[in-house]
UniProtKB/Swiss-Prot annotation:
Domain of life the protein comes from: Bacteria
Record InterPro entries: Arg_deiminase
Enzyme kind, highest EC tier: hydrolase
Lineage: Bacteria, Pseudomonadati, Pseudomonadota, Alphaproteobacteria, Hyphomicrobiales
GO-annotated biological processes: arginine catabolic process to ornithine; arginine deiminase pathway
Name the UniProt record assigns to this protein: Arginine deiminase 2
GO molecular function: arginine deiminase activity
List of catalytic residues: C407
The organism of origin for this protein: Rhizobium meliloti (strain 1021) (Ensifer meliloti)
Pathway: Amino-acid degradation; L-arginine degradation via ADI pathway; carbamoyl phosphate from L-arginine: step 1/2
């Protein structure tokens, strides 16, 4: 789809399965070349990537979406176009090059160096990181040598951000607006600043973005929110997983804001166990069609559902436990007589492996058409038997941070579905 076509539609995501029209992704790159066996845990990856293959597979992922009429925009490109705007470049550096991030010793020198970089190189550096050994001695002088000697080869003046691969989490579009999310792990905090800069300054977005909640320069304390837990499913309902990475404090604030602004009528909270293999709601539960969901039963069947609704007083909330199972709660919220459920398949061993390989992490391109990792053959076969068209992508490298197609996409424009 051309850029001209997508601009005929207002930014907003009105379902999980309607026609996907515009999406933001972030290709593997320099940040993933930084991953080593000694730092990958701290950077939230379970292993290092074969980066060349990851790039190839991600390009195929983007191509398959474009072949189905989706406009795909890539974060490195958007950021390079954003930092070409002097005001945007200054805003990013004002918020990235700060003592808490880079230290005091070389603060002015790092700022001066970054200000002088070409647009594309600055974008690559903001996402890919800047090590002490890459920083020019002409800028750092004797202080740089001392920092190198003291901190060693693993020290970064700007940290790499490999989790930008999973664009779902940093911001999430909920009906007609977006949230700028305070992420759980420190390794990801800077991602939201970069995404915010794109929405705030890029010509495609400036003046067109309605921010519901969140501000990346604010300390949110225990209020953390990640987009993998957030699903605007339609009919004024929003699903939010209370998970390893999304907290009750954030959910209640977001619910109150959505109600106050008339953006939603009900927020259904999925109370989940706090597990690495089920870090977000979308790792165990995704839609495959308007009336069909794929679930990892070992987790989803244990989810307790609660619902926030507007209280009687302005700004107040009512919270009630929902009757029935989580899937039944979702079915009833959408007014469906029946919700078809496909469970990730096989015996206990196959199910656990499938879950580790993001087998339940589908992204719908349109009703009944999904992208899924090729390696989860058993589950993909079950989806096809249920009438779902499954387009496969290679997940051997892309999934090493525990995310699939849903995690790797930030929908910006998606149609509603009639229920």
């Amino acid at each position: 789809m051309s850029s001209k076509s997508s601009t005929q539609h207002t930014f907003g995501v009105h379902s999980e399965v309607g026609q996907l029209r515009k999406v933001m992704v972030c290709a593997p790159g320099r940040a993933h070349q930084r991953l080593t066996p000694s730092n990958c845990d701290a950077l939230l990856f379970d292993d290092v990537l074969w980066v060349d293959n990851a790039r190839r597979d991600h390009f195929d992922f983007m191509t398959k979406m474009r072949d189905r009429g989706v406009e795909v925009v890539e974060m490195h490109n958007l950021l390079a176009q954003t930092v070409a705007i002097p005001e945007a470049r200054k805003w990013i550096l004002d918020n990235q090059v700060v003592p808490n991030q880079v230290g005091l010793e070389l603060l002015d020198e790092i700022r001066s160096y970054l200000e002088g970089l070409p647009d594309r190189e600055l974008a690559e550096t903001l996402i890919g990181g800047l090590s002490t050994h890459e920083f020019p001695e002409t800028h750092g002088g004797e202080m740089l040598e001392l920092i190198r000697d003291a901190a060693g080869v693993a020290e970064y003046l700007l940290p790499p951000l490999p989790n930008t691969l999973y664009t779902r989490d940093t911001t999430c579009w909920i009906y007609g607006g977006v949230t700028l999310n305070p992420l759980y792990w420190p390794a990801r905090h800077e991602e939201t600043i970069l995404a915010t800069a794109i929405y705030k300054f890029h010509p495609d977005f400036v003046g067109k973005v309605n921010v519901w909640w969140g501000e990346p320069t604010t300390d949110w304390g225990l209020a953390t929110l990640e987009g993998g837990d957030v699903m605007p499913i339609g009919k004024g309902n929003v699903l939010i997983g209370m998970s390893e990475r999304t907290s009750r404090q954030a959910i209640s604030q977001l619910a109150a804001t959505l109600f106050e602004k008339g953006a939603a009528q009900r927020v259904i909270v999925a109370a989940m166990p706090k597990l690495r293999a089920a870090m977000h709601l979308d790792t165990v539960f995704t839609f495959a069609d308007r009336d069909c969901v794929l679930i990892y039963p070992d987790i989803v069947n244990e989810i307790e559902a609660f619902s926030y609704r507007p209280g009687e007083k302005p700004g107040s909330l009512e919270l009630h436990k929902d009757r029935g199972s989580f899937v039944e709660t979702v079915r009833d919220a959408l007014g469906l007589k029946e919700m078809r459920v496909v469970e990730t398949g096989g015996n206990a061993y196959v199910r656990e492996r499938t879950q580790w390989d993001s087998g339940a992490n589908l992204v719908c391109l349109s009703p009944g058409v999904v992208l899924a990792y090729d390696r989860n053959t058993y589950t993909n076969t079950l989806l096809r038997k249920a009438g779902v068209e499954v387009i496969t992508i290679t997940g051997a490298e892309l999934g090493r941070g525990r995310g699939g197609g849903h995690c790797m996409t930030c929908p910006i424009i998606r149609d509603a579905v009639d229920y």
